[in-house]
Amino acid sequence: MFRGNFETSIDAKGRTSLPAKFREVLVDSFGDERFFMTNSNPVRLGDGGYSSGLVIYPYNEWLALEEKLKVGTGLGLSSAELASVKRRIVAPAVECVADKLGRILVPPHLRKSACLEREILFVGMLNKAEIWSQAEWEKVFRQDIENFPIDSPVLAELGL
């Protein structure tokens, strides 16, 4: 599973390094070095705005997600909502693999949508990983504090 936060940088051409731990997880936990990169779900901020990063799905996790979205039934989404998800998440997705040195290329359309300019952060999210600009991550992390389910019986049950 993907765990931890890793600060790094991205250059003007969109090159960055996938953390070594994440490369290991792709192969050891998911059996494939390939992955898909796309926009993450937008996060609603307290000021009424939105923030978004990128998300990395292991290859087979992505294929399973595509199948669910292709069928579309039983997801609880209207046809307009499903179309929005497909346009926002599926359409910009790119298949990737890190080179021997662990470098990946983030395409311009994804860099732009996630506001990735220089300092970035890889965030482990168990079965997927996220990529955020440092500035956007700080906004989202502050919002997470607001959204955190304090005194939740579910969290207590989990031991959190």
From Swiss-Prot:
InterPro entries xref list: MraZ (IPR003444), MraZ_C (IPR035644), MraZ_dom (IPR020603), MraZ_N (IPR035642), MraZ_sf (IPR038619), SpoVT-AbrB_dom (IPR007159), SpoVT-AbrB_sf (IPR037914)
One GO MF term, please? Answer: DNA-binding transcription factor activity
Q: Which SUPFAM superfamilies match?
A: AbrB/MazE/MraZ-like
Q: Where in the cell is it found?
A: Cytoplasm, Nucleoid
GO CC, one annotated term: cytoplasm
Please state every residue range assigned to the domain named SpoVT-AbrB: 5-50, 93-136
Question: Which domain of life does the UniProt lineage start with?
Answer: Bacteria
Q: Which family does it belong to?
A: Belongs to the MraZ family.
Instruction: Spell out the protein name for this chain.
Output: Transcriptional regulator MraZ
Annotated source species: Geotalea daltonii (strain DSM 22248 / JCM 15807 / FRC-32)
